[in-house]
Amino acid sequence: MANDVVLTPMMKQFFELKAKHPDAIMLFRCGDFYETYSEDAIVASEILGITLTKRANGQAKSVEMAGFPFHALDTYLPKLVRAGKRVAICDQLEDPKMTKKLVKRGITELVTPGVAINDNVLSYKENNFLAAVHFGKASCGVAFLDISTGEFLTAEGPFDYIDKLLNNFAPKEVLFERGKRGMFEGNFGSKFFTFELDDWVFNESSSREKLLKHFETKNLKGFGVEHLKNGIVASGAILQYLNMTQHYQIGHITSLSRIEEDRYVRLDKFTVRSLELIGSMNEGGTSLLDVIDRTISPMGARLLKRWVVFPLKDEKPVNERLDVVEYFFREPDFKEFIEEKLHLIGDLERIVSKAAVGRISPREVVQLKVALQAIEPIKNACLNADNGSLRRIGEQLNLCLSIREKIAKEVKNDPPLLVNKGGVIADGVNAELDELRQIAFSGKDYLLKVQQRESELTGIPSLKIAYNNVFGYYIEVRNTHKDKVPADWIRKQTLVNAERYITQELKEYEEKILGAEDKILVLETKLYNELVVALAEFIPAIQINASQIARLDCLLAFANVAKENNYIRPVVEDSEVIDIRQGRHPVIEKQLPVGEKYIANDVFLDSETQQIIIITGPNMAGKSALLRQTALITLLAQMGSFVPAESARIGMVDKIFTRVGASDNISVGESTFMVEMNEAANILNNLSSRSLVLFDELGRGTSTYDGISIAWAIVEHIHEHPKAKARTLFATHYHELNEMEKSFKRIKNYNVSVKEIDNKVIFLRKLERGGSEHSFGIHVAKMAGMPKSIVKRANDILHQLETDNRQQGIAKPTAEIASGRSGMQLSFFQLDDPVLSQIRDEILNLDVNNLTPLEALNKLNDIKKIVKGK
């Protein structure tokens, strides 16, 4: 606003508060409404679909306005946050009835996509993480906080590791240092909602100090993060941001955990996406998580999502999970009992977090009591189970008896949603409250008794007690009986046929009854808040309960999925063997029409005899599905789940790499081929002896010979790698790669079989030994409805090309490549030096048979000049 424009006092107050958070939409409490003004009103009206109008604004004449009733905040606030808006809630800080001046207002909360506690903003099956990224000199630090659950985690490492974490945790908001947007988006993309903070926030000493002060410790060694300097900076930035957004009550954030990279299978963002672990690449599609999520509690659903993207790579904890799943199978009564009790738990994790921040409703307090009551039989059942992991869960569950009993004693079983509605605190808890309720809710009975008593004492049968706003409670007596009125009654009003009186008793009762309801609400709120404060000391114990219940829920879900889909327990071991018999794709088999059976397949990989399988076969035959199902079965096993197969022996993998399908990078200007090469390079530069590698149709987007050459070289590199014999499935249309089996002992050819009957192709979807020489692409085109003339012409061209290739002898060169390979030893012609490359090209272009001695000397002199130029 221009300085020379005089605003109304309220609008001046608005713009002063708005200046503190110019990037946020301000919801300004005005009586019974939250209102937005100026640019905020324009944006809010579009997002919320509410009317845009104007408000008088002094000499500025008017300002845009849009608003909604204050009680509809929970409806409209989530819409703004989901639209990626930061929202400043400005409340009235005093009762308008108690002041004649402008009502004092202040910002009571700043809600952002990453800092939300409102149930309508949150998804019960997903965490709502806020992340902070700090760019160090040699590495990067990251921290994640879900204020709705209290989970606080940190890590540091190279950019690709932080990128993986950001994609797996999928934060709703990411903080980083102001001025580093280019660095952030260059490494992590632009898909995140981000917010920049001043550089002073990202300071190691102040961040460490904030963490020590919050956790009330002398150092961070107990959390295992003392050495993570960049992670500490990121974690401190998150605490500072909570302070900036006025989230001061954070007692439920009780620990800071290190994300232990060495505990989990490495899955980069390409693998998570291409395997469709937690989301489908097609709108409305089904992910692995959709298939296996049979969790009952919201905590279980959130934990299962974490397990899917963080499979274990240590066989001991994997087998402990499998033992519990098997126990559920062996003991169906136990499983059903636990299942029944889990239905009573609710979202224990978020409920207790609401207690910490002072946002817990009376009904949620009762739900907390019900959950704690359900934990007792779960604890006893687990303690008596014939399974070590279940007994350990039972040992960690805390009954929290004292707070459970306090809630049962003090809160009614069916309270209202809000404490200010009254009727929350049980009878018998507080004598004053009981008396006030007696006065407020038994008033009619009391007045009737007074009326009967006075009628009998005075002998006036028509006497009645009533109330008006002028002088409160009164006794009305007809004129025919006014001579019977006692002397201590005070006459207040004379009517035509009657007179009205008050008594000292009625005045005292009036004072009690008129203030009783207000006093009840004040006293109930006080008692309720004291109960919530008492909950605080039980937060750590209840959080442990929530984590153990979530774990139990996930394992129960694995058992139910296995039973429903006929999964078996895999053998998970410390070997380099993957031996899957009659394996099935867990997602595809659930999508098949009723009555159609999934065609199961065997896959065997090891580091000694069959390290690499080259799979050929036509389009639509099922090569891609076979690759994915192998990875999914392996991942399910290492999550601790049973798997879709007749038997499965899984030697632990530490990394799974995929080069399957298209990539997001295509949309930002990179060609399909460049994307393939980038992802392939990432795989080849990070191979380990326990890696599982999936390549699907590598080499598209370039010439056939380029594609064959690159595919060949990559397969050869993986086979000949001196340290890492990565188990690999390589699906390809390049049938020339079948020649590799002859010269590379750990490469084996397989094909996905088809039958050709009467010029029609039948896909058998069965993996068989040996390579395939046909892609049947023209048959697929015909099936897709391609015009017959085009199909016929394509067949003619194919016949001509195949004839030409046979005449040129393309099979002979590929065989010679295999026999003439030099393994991992680099020859003169494999060097990357540009001068040597130029010399090589000069020599290769010589026609030695027709070169004269003089021409040879001249050429040698040219080469000498090239060398001197070096």
Curated annotation (Swiss-Prot):
GO cellular component: cytosol
UniProt keyword terms in alphabetical order: ATP-binding, DNA damage, DNA repair, DNA-binding, Nucleotide-binding
Molecular functions per Gene Ontology: ATP binding; ATP-dependent DNA damage sensor activity; damaged DNA binding; mismatched DNA binding
Gene Ontology biological process terms in this record: mismatch repair
Domain of life, source organism: Bacteria
SUPFAM superfamilies the record matches: DNA repair protein MutS, domain I (SSF55271), DNA repair protein MutS, domain II (SSF53150), DNA repair protein MutS, domain III (SSF48334), P-loop containing nucleoside triphosphate hydrolases (SSF52540)
Key word DNA-binding present: yes
Similarity field: Belongs to the DNA mismatch repair MutS family.
Main function: This protein is involved in the repair of mismatches in DNA. It is possible that it carries out the mismatch recognition step. This protein has a weak ATPase activity.
Name this protein carries in UniProt: DNA mismatch repair protein MutS
Source species of the chain: Phocaeicola vulgatus (strain ATCC 8482 / DSM 1447 / JCM 5826 / CCUG 4940 / NBRC 14291 / NCTC 11154) (Bacteroides vulgatus)
Lineage, broadest ranks: Bacteria, Pseudomonadati, Bacteroidota, Bacteroidia, Bacteroidales
